[in-house]
UniProtKB/Swiss-Prot annotation:
Coiled coil: none annotated. The glycine cleavage system catalyzes the degradation of glycine. SUPFAM superfamilies: Aminomethyltransferase beta-barrel domain, Folate-binding domain. One of its GO terms (biological process) is glycine decarboxylation via glycine cleavage system. The glycine cleavage system is composed of four proteins: P, T, L and H. The keyword Repeat does not apply. The lineage of its organism: Bacteria, Pseudomonadati, Pseudomonadota, Betaproteobacteria, Burkholderiales. It catalyses: N(6)-[(R)-S(8)-aminomethyldihydrolipoyl]-L-lysyl-[protein] + (6S)-5,6,7,8-tetrahydrofolate = N(6)-[(R)-dihydrolipoyl]-L-lysyl-[protein] + (6R)-5,10-methylene-5,6,7,8-tetrahydrofolate + NH4(+). One of its GO terms (cellular component) is glycine cleavage complex. It comes from Cupriavidus necator (strain ATCC 17699 / DSM 428 / KCTC 22496 / NCIMB 10442 / H16 / Stanier 337). GO terms for molecular function: aminomethyltransferase activity; transaminase activity. This is Aminomethyltransferase.
Amino acid sequence: MTLQATPLNAIHRALGARMVDFGGWDMPVNYGSQIEEHNAVRTDAGMFDVSHMCVVDLAGANTRSFLRGLLANNVDKLQTPGKALYSCMLDEKGGVIDDLIVYFFAEDRFRLVVNASTALGDIEWIRARNAATGSDVTITPRREDVAPAGVQPLAIVAVQGPNARTKVWSTFPSTQPSDTLKPFNAAVVQDPALGEIMVARTGYTGEDGFELVVPAENVAAIWEKLNAAGVRPAGLGARDTLRLEAGMNLYGQDMDINTSPLDAGLAWTVDLQSERDFTGKAALAAAGSRQQFLGLILRDKGGVLRAHQKVITPAGDGEITSGTFSPSLSQSIAFARLPKDVAVGDTVQVEIRDRKLNATVVKLPFVRNGKALVS
């Protein structure tokens, strides 16, 4: 099978990146040292090519009401242009089709950013719901492989770290209006050479920074200028350790179509209290939450916490969904679905090969804005 490639593929290869198959995409896992890339984001600034993710623009007079029924979180929270909201999109059984970010620009104009591996299915689902509800929303995917003819494809570069925003501003003065952006807000600016840039104060690392949504034809120039300004290229390996430390779920790993958001630490993104109906609401209300979603820190030596390892507790067994060695903490950490009677601070055991190693249950996240929140 031929892998799909982002517009930055040739640049990754020229930089000596180790490339891997990531859900059918040819993507950089690192450029030499995953730990150095991780630490650059925690202490300075790093950048990620996330152009495999898909922007989907929604337009029309009924867009808000359509999204009120499509998403588990409530888009009525979005009243200021540029404001963003994290949400799950559920099926009728309450399973997670995808997790995404929705941006509000005007009553007739919203933007979604969805995951790479789910993008085609997401678009199909959104179109089907649009038809079923008679919402008459115009749905326009913007990734190169799915953008309609005549529509400008978009690419995405995430610039993350304590110095990320100042390096973006100094490299692209046109983005300076974004200096007043609060977290989870976006601004659209015009660059004389690079065209329209959406600057979003969002990310997937637990650090401050921007995600830049740019014309695909100009993303190489943007990447090279940021690289020249000292923003370090970082691959999927560092992205995974950073998001794990930050307590951020990965679709397909920590939740999927067979998982309720209530069992994946995402109850805060689900609006069950208001009268608003949405796809999956009845199923979630009927089933409730069956498990907790918490963090683990390995206390014994002799292993690394990994997905699918069994967690043994006095209240019954649980399972790790994501695990890694944390460069920031120098400890092995994990997310786990655990029985409801397990408490933060409890000691549990994790089956690693033929051994049972002790781990401590902790509240997520592990690290935020460069500071350890656990010990």
